[in-house]
Amino acid sequence: LVPKNLFGNTVYLDPIKKANHYASLLRNEEKCDLVICLSHLGFKYKNDKVSDMVLATQSRDIDLIIGGHTHTFLKNPVRMQNLDKEEVLVNQVGWAGINLGKVDFHFSQNRGSKKVFGRSIFVQNSSKEA
């Protein structure tokens, strides 16, 4: 992704393998009901480059991916299926605070039962210009 002279001894690790490792740890060992991945992979590319959409389909135990890098404006989160055919939400809301994202997860008393609602909120300039 970046020429070697610009990253020195930095090691690039496979984001899908790392995401799956830590999502499993959070879900199974720490018993988290909700696992959120903050990503800067980019929403989607024309080729098979790793992106938020690829991560969603190649992952397990992640409920929500909040992404960046490509500055994609989504009106609502995209619903994808992971390797276990479970729903993963992918969301980006652009850049520069133009939009805010809101995703609500409602959990029932029965572990594993949840409802999800998400949307983007357009931020308007509320100050008056002279």
What residues fall within each predicted segment?
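Acidic, metal/ion-coordinating pockets
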Residues: 1-128
